[in-house]
Amino acid sequence: MARVKRGNIARKRRNKILNLAKGFRGGNKNLFRTANQRVMKALCNAYRDRRRRKRDFRRLWISRINASARINGTNYSRLINGMKNSEIIINRKMLAQLALSDPQCFEKIVSTVNN
């Protein structure tokens, strides 16, 4: 029987994990077992946070809109309700950007909604 040279596929698998672990600190970057654990944890965190990012940005936009709306004499919920009633279709991302970069335009939107 011929001699079996082992390790090609195993080495590829291990190197794949170790490449994903680049930039980790200590043994987490070059010891396979700990690197594997850290990579699995990192991938779990990345998966979770890709979903969380959407929530976080929406919360940020809402708080920015609310702060600007309160400066203009109303609050977030009344502003959004008024926009729906007066059929102004601007999403929260664009509204927050307007509140930040163009306060005069945001003020006009608030006055339109209030009237």
UniProtKB/Swiss-Prot annotation:
Entry-linked CDD domains: Ribosomal_L20
GO cellular component terms given for this protein: ribonucleoprotein complex; ribosome
Keywords: Ribonucleoprotein, Ribosomal protein, RNA-binding, rRNA-binding
Coiled coil regions in record: none
Gene Ontology MF terms: rRNA binding; structural constituent of ribosome
Domain of life: Bacteria
Signal sequence extent: none
Pfam families membership: Ribosomal_L20
Tagged with keyword rRNA-binding: yes
Gene Ontology BP annotations: ribosomal large subunit assembly; translation
Annotated Gene3D superfamilies: 6.10.160.10, Ribosomal protein L20 (1.10.1900.20)
Family listed: Belongs to the bacterial ribosomal protein bL20 family.
UniProt cross-references to PANTHER family, sorted A to Z: 39S RIBOSOMAL PROTEIN L20
NCBIfam families given in the database record: rplT_bact
Job description of the protein: Binds directly to 23S ribosomal RNA and is necessary for the in vitro assembly process of the 50S ribosomal subunit. It is not involved in the protein synthesizing functions of that subunit.
Protein name per the record: Large ribosomal subunit protein bL20
Organism of derivation: Prochlorococcus marinus subsp. pastoris (strain CCMP1986 / NIES-2087 / MED4)
